[in-house]
């Protein structure tokens, strides 16, 4: 059994962006697509043409003028059937994490459970408390996975990759790149 799962920061999930995601899912045979930074408010399940479904999780109301936070999981018809077979339960961990379970059958008819998580990490400008809360929430979401479940996490980790040059000197107490491998920070 082989499935395709994509993950992407959407920087605001407008109708045109969602249409593009749905079109790509159909063309490429994508099972599920995790989206972060959707800027959508509230929790909802939207049904779309062809049996596709979008599950949204976000703050109850806008936290800024342009929008912020919000995660979604878009399912193709097979994934949606598996979501329903597993009980159609959405689990929310803070405002940044959405988790669902999908039940499928393998080639021998045995049940397979997939725990699918969409997560959006705080950026470097967020408070230490927000970062710690996210880490706690993500740990809870991951630990909610049963022993025999397949865990898939689609996440915008807000990571910044770079490297230290031989001539670089690190200031005490400042988080910088940890090694010499990576890309030059831009």
Q: How does the language model describe each region?
A:
Residues 1-186:
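A shared catalytic/ligand-binding motif for oxyanion handling
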């Amino acid at each position: 059994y082989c499935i395709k799962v994509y993950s992407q920061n959407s920087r605001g999930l407008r109708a045109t962006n969602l249409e593009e995601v749905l079109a790509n899912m159909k063309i490429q045979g994508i099972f599920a697509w995790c989206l972060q930074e959707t800027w959508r408010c509230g929790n909802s399940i939207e049904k779309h043409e062809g049996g596709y479904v979008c599950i949204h999780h976000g703050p109850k109301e806008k936290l800024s003028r342009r929008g912020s936070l919000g995660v979604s999981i878009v399912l193709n018809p097979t994934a949606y059937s598996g979501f329903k077979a597993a009980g159609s339960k959405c689990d929310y961990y803070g405002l940044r994490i959405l988790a669902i379970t999908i039940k499928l059958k393998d080639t021998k008819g045995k049940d397979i459970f997939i725990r699918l998580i969409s997560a959006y990490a705080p950026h470097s400008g967020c408070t230490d408390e927000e970062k710690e809360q996210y880490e706690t929430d993500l740990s809870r979401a991951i630990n909610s996975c049963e022993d025999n479940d397949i865990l898939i996490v689609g996440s915008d980790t807000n990571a910044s990759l770079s490297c230290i040059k031989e001539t670089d000197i690190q200031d005490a107490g400042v988080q910088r790149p940890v090694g010499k491998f990576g890309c030059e920070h831009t």
